[in-house]
């Protein structure tokens, strides 16, 4: 039997709700909140297997088996540009790294007003002369200077941007490619922004 959100909340108030009940309450409220969802929007509201593992664990440590499963699923999700080029144009990547555009929900419909951005600067320090930067993630200043721009580094960088969980399961890094927020071509531009010697990121 599936209960509506009010009934679930009332039941939960009688005793402290267990995690399963709390999850059911949250999922029911979210699903009932959108009266005219599109299939694309409904899909965005569903957690995939990796997200369910990470949400269930919370602040606890993953077991080796759980970590291995998340990594395996993440690696299987990675797709590469049709052109085969993992390094695009650093200038385009610069724009993407500072652009926070994304999908918008209007009247229950998921709409895209413009091409999505990556907004990397929200969590990372990028060019050394920038002031408004984030510190949630590690600094990326001098990324290419420290690592070089070999094919191996380009591939590693591409995959970490596409789905960081392939290397750090359940990390806070958004899975920009796996969630289709960015296209493979856009991610290739971000790779160039990080490793191209001419990029502001790699200026001394």
Where are the model-predicted features located?
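Short coil/linker segments at helix-helix boundaries
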Residues: 75, 103-116
């Amino acid at each position: 039997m599936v209960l509506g959100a009010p009934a679930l909340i009332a039941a939960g108030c009688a005793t402290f709700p267990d995690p399963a009940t709390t999850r059911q309450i949250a999922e029911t409220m979210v699903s009932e909140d959108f009266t005219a969802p599109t299939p694309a929007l409904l899909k965005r509201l569903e957690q995939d297997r990796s997200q369910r593992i990470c949400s269930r664990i919370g602040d606890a440590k993953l077991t080796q088996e759980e970590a291995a499963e998340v990594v395996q699923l993440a690696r299987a999700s990675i797709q590469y540009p049709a052109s085969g080029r993992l390094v695009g144009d650093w200038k385009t990547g610069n724009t993407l790294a500072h652009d926070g555009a994304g999908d918008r929900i209007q009247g229950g419909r998921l709409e895209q007003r413009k091409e999505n951005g990556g907004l990397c600067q929200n969590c990372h320090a990028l060019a050394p002369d920038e002031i408004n930067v984030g510190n949630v993630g590690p600094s990326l200043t001098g990324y290419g200077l420290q690592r070089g721009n070999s094919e191996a580094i380009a591939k590693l960088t591409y995959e970490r941007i596409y789905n960081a969980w392939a290397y750090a399961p359940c990390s806070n890094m958004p899975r920009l490619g796996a969630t289709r927020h960015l296209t493979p071509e856009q991610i290739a531009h971000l790779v160039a922004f990080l490793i191209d010697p001419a990029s502001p990121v790699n200026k001394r």
